[in-house]
Swiss-Prot record:
Keywords: Cytoplasm, Glycolysis, Lyase, Magnesium, Metal-binding, Secreted
Protein's cellular compartments: Cytoplasm; Secreted; Cell surface
Primary role: Catalyzes the reversible conversion of 2-phosphoglycerate (2-PG) into phosphoenolpyruvate (PEP). It is essential for the degradation of carbohydrates via glycolysis.
Record's protein name: Enolase
NCBIfam families, A to Z: eno
GO CC annotation: cell surface; extracellular region; phosphopyruvate hydratase complex
Amino-acid positions noted as binding Mg(2+) in the UniProt annotation, renumbered to this chain: 241, 284, 311
GO biological process: glycolytic process
Ranges in coiled-coil conformation: none
Top EC group: lyase
Active-site feature positions: 204 (proton donor), 336 (proton acceptor)
Main location: cytoplasm
Family: Belongs to the enolase family.
């Protein structure tokens, strides 16, 4: 009854107006699942390959080759298989691709099918996706990392670091956390406008003011938290995504906005200094993706009191994560479904992290759609944290709104992660 009878891939547009893959999966019993694949702006060198067409169409960014793979080879390989056998289906597609990074069929093709299959199987079972994937213990609503100031590859301003986020750990519920974040977001907008800064929003809904340094951005955020009626370091904490690989050149960290170049040891000390001065509880990609020694220095400096998240470092890849665990590097993994390219591999990465007492943060990409799958996956994995943008743009709010619905569905079972994400 849950056999796959049809798969339809199509090319749609993401939140940046670039093509991406959407997949529909139909089962024998009439159940249906649909998934759209996200896309990143700052991508790690070790990520699975997002297949693009090249040529002039969509300036080379078309995904017709990936769509053809969905409608052709992939359907031929998994048509007739039971949608409830997720691991078998994912393995079949990975083996069909035959490359270590999914470069032949494209991670965007494989992931679209993988997620749509899970959604169809969830519908067939009569369960919401978070319950189908996570089982009866899926109940933890994640603390949002809300990206309210953008820099780096996400903005046309001098700020070197890519994201400055607020985390409303003092909220009682997810719904309250969203409200608190919204209040700070709108307060920040007023503060920026009053100081003559542009308040247009970037790819992920955050502001991109013409500030020159991380401390300048953090000072604005501190004022906005207080102005909104909350206490920094009590009700609200801060998270950074440095995206350091983007400014790591010839073995050094080139902070153009701040007008200085730092050796890896000095970069680690700078981040430790910021974490000491501001209520920063999470730093993502504080060091570059292949600067393992720098990562070790940073971990030794602040790893006991600050969450150190590997994004480009681990790329949702269990093998790279295991290497990091052995070396005592970082203490958390950012989970992006399209970095690895299948649901089962994503779940394996989260499980690997949790077994090693590393935290996991479910994450969007800068190019998103209205698809809210990652909200369900955050609850399914009980990971306790989600990074899905600011309090603007419907492609970001789709995830927050889905989390509000899930919290409502769970009723008394629902638990907001809140202060449990604090270290030390």
């Amino acid at each position: 009854m849950t056999a796959i009878i049809d798969i339809i891939g199509r090319e749609i547009l993401d939140s940046r107006g670039n093509p991406t893959v959407e997949v529909d999966v139909h089962l024998e019993d009439g159940s249906f699942g649909r998934a759209a694949v996200p896309s990143g702006a700052s991508t790690g060198a070790h990520e699975a390959v997002e297949l693009r067409d090249g040529g002039t169409r969509y300036l080379g960014k078309g995904v017709e080759r990936a769509v053809d793979a969905v409608n052709g080879e992939i359907f031929e390989a998994i048509g007739g298989l039971d949608a409830e056998n997720q691991i078998q289906i994912d393995r079949t597609m990975i083996e069909l691709d035959g490359t270590p990074n999914k470069s032949r069929l494209g991670a965007n093709a494989i992931l679209g099918v993988s997620l749509a299959v899970a959604k169809a199987a969830a519908e067939a079972s009569g369960l919401p996706l978070y319950r189908y994937v996570g089982g009866p213990n899926a109940h933890l609503l994640p603390v949002p990392m809300m990206n309210i100031i953008n820099g780096g590859a996400h903005a046309d301003n001098p700020i070197d670091f890519q994201e400055f986020m607020i985390m409303p750990v003092g909220a009682e519920t997810l719904k309250d956390a969203v409200r608190m974040g919204s209040e700070v977001f709108h307060t920040l907008k007023k503060q920026l406008a009053a100081d003559g800064h542009n308040t247009n929003v970037g790819d992920e809904g955050g502001f991109a003011p013409g500030l020159a340094s991380a401390p300048a951005a953090l000072d604005f955020i501190m004022k906005s938290i207080e102005k909104a009626g909350y206490k920094p370091g009590e009700d609200m904490y801060v998270a950074l995504d440095c995206a350091s690989t983007e400014f790591f050149k010839d073995g050094k960290y080139v902070l153009e906005g701040e007008g200085r170049t730092l050796e890896p040891g000095a970069m680690a000390e700078y981040l430790a200094e910021l974490a000491g001065k501001y209520p920063i509880i999470s730093i993502e990609d504080g060091m570059a993706e292949d600067d393992w020694d720098g990562w070790k220095s940073l971990t030794d400096l602040v790893g006991n009191k600050c969450q150190l998240v590997g994004d480009d470092l681990f790329v949702t890849n269990s093998a790279r994560l295991r290497d990091g665990i052995k070396m005592g590097v970082a203490n958390s993994i950012l989970v992006k479904v399209n970095q690895i390219g299948s649901l089962s591999e994503t779940l394996d990465a989260v499980e690997t992290a949790h077994k090693a007492r590393y935290t996991a943060v479910m994450s969007h990409r800068s190019g998103e759609t209205e698809d809210s799958t990652i909200a369900d996956l955050a609850v399914a994995t009980n990971c306790g944290q989600i990074k899905t943008g600011s309090l603007a743009r419907s492609d970001r709010l789709a995830k927050y709104n889905q989390l509000i619905r899930i919290e409502e569905q769970l009723g008394p079972q629902a638990q907001y992660a809140g202060r449990s994400v604090l270290r030390g």
